[in-house]
């Protein structure tokens, strides 16, 4: 909280399939995020609606099968995600975002995908 000068807002996940926030929420920029609606309790959904102007739903089948909720947007323009999430990719394209598909199926077997593989530096 102090390092980034941001408020921490707790969100509750209600489904075991979405065991980390990075499996069901992908911030694109300060106004836009992808999310899996069924992963969050009602109170958390309200918080998300207040926090983002644009919430784009990730189809649940793509979140579960392809880890579409584990994508990463480093710059507000490019979204790196596991290949195969055609519906989510179409939604992102309609927003003018460029999707970079990568193959992470071996990492998915261990419970992670793109977001879990990145390294950030500040």
Where are these regions (language model features)?
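The feature marks the mature, well-folded catalytic cores of soluble enzymes
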Residues: 1-122
């Amino acid at each position: 909280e102090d390092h980034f000068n941001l408020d921490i807002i707790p969100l509750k996940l209600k489904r075991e399939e979405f065991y980390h926030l990075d499996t069901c929420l992908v911030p694109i920029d300060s106004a836009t995020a992808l999310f899996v609606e069924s992963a969050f309790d009602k109170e958390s959904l309200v918080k998300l609606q207040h926090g983002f102007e644009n919430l784009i739903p990730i189809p649940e089948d793509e979140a579960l099968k392809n880890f579409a909720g584990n994508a990463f947007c480093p710059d507000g323009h490019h979204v790196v995600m596991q290949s195969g999430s055609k519906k989510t990719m179409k939604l992102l394209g309609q927003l003018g975002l460029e999707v970079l598909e990568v193959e992470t199926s071996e990492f998915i077997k261990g419970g992670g995908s793109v977001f879990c593989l990145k390294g950030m530096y500040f």
